[in-house]
Amino acid sequence: DRGLFWQKFSDFNEDGTVKTDVGVLIKVKQISCYGNDSYGGMSGRDIMALACGLYESCDFGYMHDRVQQCEYLAQGFYKAGVKGVVLPAGGHAVYINMDEFFDGKRDHTTFAGTGFSLELIRRYGIRVSELGDFSMEYDLKTPEQQAELANVVRFAIDRSRLTQEHLDYVIAAVKALYEDRESIPNMRIVWGHKLPMRHFHAFLEPYANEEK
């Protein structure tokens, strides 16, 4: 909405182009304080469910099961021959190092980890989080900062929702994708390259690995 508020509080260059979009600034603040504009609010019922979940998560039996599920998934990836599995697994998620997954053949600026997450949900309906080169803004960092970044994808395990059959499906899907990893596309940013927290609202498009 580029109405009076936007016109009054945005900054413009002399030629009339937008220098600072106040709408983007407000959205970034909203994401960091509350959540994305697509998340919706929480009803009283949801808040009570959250309180119950926090109480249950303090139970030792629950925590043990969480750790065991993460270990099962990580070991499943490892035994399937998938490279880059971060071991030992933690208590809420399993991580795969994308540099090792792609045998070091993908440049950091190709954002191949995002391509991996795209193909995993497109082919198998599995949603993961890329927490590497794209999310951590590798291309905008200094060489010293780049050396400290981990190029990983996170498989967070939903609490009290996934059975062993679910995890076996994820293992089989990642194994199949690993064996076909040469076909996984790279990604380029088409809008929002320098936006704060760009992984929430930038736009990307895939391109073939052979294309430069």
List PLM regions with ranges.
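Generic non-transmembrane alpha-helical segments
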Residues: 72-80, 115-126, 171-180
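A broad, low-specificity signal marking well-ordered, structured residues that form hydrophobic/aromatic
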Residues: 92, 126, 153
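Active-site C-terminal subdomain of aminotransferase-like
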Residues: 1-113, 118, 134
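Compositionally biased, intrinsically disordered low-complexity regions enriched in proline and serine
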Residues: 5-13, 125, 139, 208
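PLP-dependent enzyme catalytic core of the Aspartate aminotransferase-like
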Residues: 57-58, 123, 135-212
